From Swiss-Prot:
Pfam families: FAD_binding_6, Fer2, NAD_binding_1. It comes from Mycolicibacterium smegmatis (strain ATCC 700084 / mc(2)155). Belongs to the bacterial ring-hydroxylating dioxygenase ferredoxin reductase family. The gene is mimB. Reductase component of the propane 2-monooxygenase multicomponent enzyme system which is involved in the degradation of propane via the O2-dependent hydroxylation of propane. Reductase catalyzes the transfer of electrons from NADH or NADPH to monooxygenase. This is Propane 2-monooxygenase, reductase component. The lineage of its organism: Bacteria, Bacillati, Actinomycetota, Actinomycetes, Mycobacteriales. Gene3D superfamilies: 3.10.20.30, Nucleotide-binding domain of ferredoxin-NADP reductase (FNR) module, Translation factors.
């Protein structure tokens, strides 16, 4: 059995044990400690922390998430870090309410209820929890779906909320040769069973926050944002909200009627579909459509974006462009929450 070591987290005064054969983030999940995280693959930097004392070694990771100079200074990514002595680690990014009060990670057996195309490459997958009969999560989080017959998984965000405890919806982008998404072309059938593990992620509305919410999404990034909007509608949240969804053409838009209906229950809601290639074609309902990249459309409308909380979710080029725009407009980093589909576990 692997040796264990103690980890002390500063400045929150939390102690836990970690085995040498598990990374620190997984050890925290196992013990009910919910550290800030994103991709869990060493690519997004959400779990970046600073080693004050002790010996830590990292598995492979992206230098975009933690560059060589930072590593030399003592910065690590907890999702890739293994401890080989007792350690003291300074958390750079944490939510004190979440640390010991997050939803426990669950292993759930589910049954496929529906596989429904939404666009040419986005599919709605609806699963019913059967053992246990309920899956707890917060709006905006994601889960691992295990690929049938393998030890592999892919991660997808939930589009639903806890009000639909009998069903969990995922919006999945199909990729040629994708190990999970390719199964949605007739291989996964209604009645099949799929194992699910989660929830993960910090892409959630923060209790007690009052700033207006600006959501910027693209592709399957619709899922967690739709979950947030459904939650805001159900709870009669009083925060103003705007949603900018980037797509190429009208044929790439979906769930428009529901978004408009949700907006009726959200204070000062606005939805704009941003089309980068062509606005020619019919767009149902009273949807506002503007041509251009989603960041350009946001720039035209959000002249005081530094006084908002921004939620980003979509393909890496869109998220990277949005982060550059937000940085140029002096939006504080603690007011920006994002999921960027940077890892194979997200995008196939």
């Amino acid at each position: 059995m692997a040796d264990s070591h103690k980890i002390n987290f500063d400045p929150v005064d939390i102690e836990m044990e970690v085995r040498e054969d598990e990374n620190i983030l997984d050890a925290a999940f196992r013990q009910g400690i919910h550290l800030m995280h994103g991709c869990r693959e060493g690519r997004c930097s959400a779990c970046k922390s600073y080693v004050l004392d002790g010996e830590i070694q990292m598995e492979s990771y992206s230098t975009f998430a933690c560059n060589d100079a930072e590593v030399d200074e003592g910065y690590v990514l907890l999702c890739r870090s293994h401890a080989f002595s007792d350690c003291t680690i300074e958390l750079l990014n944490f939510d004190e309410d979440e640390l010991l009060g997050g939803i426990p990670i669950q292993d759930v057996r589910t049954q496929v209820q529906a596989v429904e195309p939404k666009t040419r490459d986005i599919v709605s997958l609806r699963l019913k929890p059967i053992e246990p009969g309920k899956f707890d999560f917060k709006p905006g989080q994601y889960a691992d779906l295990h690929i049938p017959g393998t030890d592999e998984h892919r991660s997808f965000s939930m589009a639903t909320t806890q009000s639909r405890s009998d069903e969990v919806e995922f919006l999945i982008k199909k990729y040629p040769g994708g190990k999970f998404s390719a199964l949605l072309d007739g291989h996964i059938q209604v009645g099949d069973e799929i194992a699910l593990t989660g929830p993960y992620g910090s892409f959630t509305l923060k209790d007690g926050h009052v700033l207006p919410v600006v959501c910027i999404g693209g592709g399957a990034g619709m899922a967690p944002i739709l979950s947030l909007l459904r939650h805001m509608n159900e709870t009669e949240n009083s925060r103003p909200a705007r949603f900018y969804y980037g797509a190429r053409t009208p044929a790439d838009l979906f769930y428009l009627d529901e978004i408009l209906e949700l907006g009726k229950g959200i204070k000062d809601f606005r939805f704009i579909a941003c089309l980068s290639e062509s606005a020619d074609g019919e767009v149902p309902g009273r949807v506002t459509v503007e041509e251009g990249m989603v960041t350009d459309v946001v720039a035209r409308h959000e002249t005081a974006i530094a006084k908002t909380e921004v939620y980003l979710c979509g393909p890496p080029p869109m998220v990277d462009a949005a982060l550059m725009f937000l940085d140029a407009n002096c939006v504080p980093k603690d007011q920006v929450f994002y999921d960027s589909f940077t890892s194979p576990i997200f995008d196939q």
